[in-house]
């Protein structure tokens, strides 16, 4: 038999502490409850330091626009000269690989249009390295990840 407790379903035989989730941090969909946060990192091609001198601010603005359009939240963000750190909260309908593809593709297209000089520095026509890092974030590690991301720019 299942019992509903604080918007989380669990079997009576399970311990209540097993679901140590703050209800304020849960998101609700039609028929489901979720909390999905990822720490995402991706680098420029050849680790070239091209995300600087105002381009970093444009990149942040583009990421915020994409978050609004695709309905995910950016909890923390830092654009470094050669890579990007994001902490995102997203819906379960999106594959994280698709989200990253959308972000990298849209930003590259807009950056190359606005800054044609980037193509000269990044021969081959690619702004981003094809790889990325995506790590799930728990309630316990979220504060550490936020502090890490926010502290990246200060260390430069």
Give the label of every model feature segment.
Residues 1-156:
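Basic nucleic-acid-binding interfaces
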């Amino acid at each position: 038999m299942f019992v509903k407790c604080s918007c989380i379903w669990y079997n009576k035989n399970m311990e209540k502490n097993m679901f140590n989730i703050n209800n304020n941090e849960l998101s609700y969909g039609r028929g489901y409850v979720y909390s999905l946060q990822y720490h995402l990192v991706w680098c420029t091609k050849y680790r070239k330091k091209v995300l600087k001198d105002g381009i970093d601010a444009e990149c942040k603005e583009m990421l915020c626009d994409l978050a609004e359009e695709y309905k995910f939240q950016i909890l923390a963000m830092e654009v470094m000269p050669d890579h990007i750190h994001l902490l995102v909260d997203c819906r379960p309908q999106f594959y994280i690989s698709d989200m990253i593809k959308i972000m990298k593709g849209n930003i590259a297209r807009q950056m190359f249009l606005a800054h044609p000089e980037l193509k000269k520095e990044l021969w081959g026509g690619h702004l981003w390295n094809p790889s990325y890092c995506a790590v799930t974030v728990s309630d316990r590690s979220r504060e550490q990840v936020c502090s890490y991301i926010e502290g990246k720019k200060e260390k430069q």
